[in-house]
């Protein structure tokens, strides 16, 4: 079962990746798993949450904008982005937001 990320006290940043997939599935699951594994090793990474139906939403949490920029520039992540553009995504949008408050149980 997916879990909710255990994030620190705000402020921190959320990268919200919303997508609609193509029908091409070759290599997608392995790459998605690798990206979560690799992101978790990056400085400033705080956690990730993901859900998919017709529209997929993945939210990764980061300590600062510099960490997000470094992750975007990571060589393996750039390869995943290239394959996503070419094969896996029909549409996508990435949004970056500053989390100023959070609460929950």
What residue spans do the PLM features occupy?
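Short S/T/G/P-rich N-terminal loop/turn motif that feeds into the first structured element of a domain
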Residues: 1-56, 65-73, 89-105
């Amino acid at each position: 079962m997916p879990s909710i990320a255990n994030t620190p006290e705000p402020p921190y940043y959320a990268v919200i990746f919303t997508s609609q997939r193509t029908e091409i599935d070759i290599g997608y699951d392995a790459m998605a798993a690798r990206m979560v594994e690799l992101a978790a090793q990056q400085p400033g990474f705080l956690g990730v949450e993901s859900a998919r139906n017709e529209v997929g939403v993945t939210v990764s949490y980061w300590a600062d904008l510099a960490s997000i920029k470094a992750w975007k520039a990571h060589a393996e992540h750039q390869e995943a982005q290239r394959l996503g553009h070419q094969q896996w995504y029909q549409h996508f949008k990435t949004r970056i937001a500053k989390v100023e408050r959070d609460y929950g149980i």
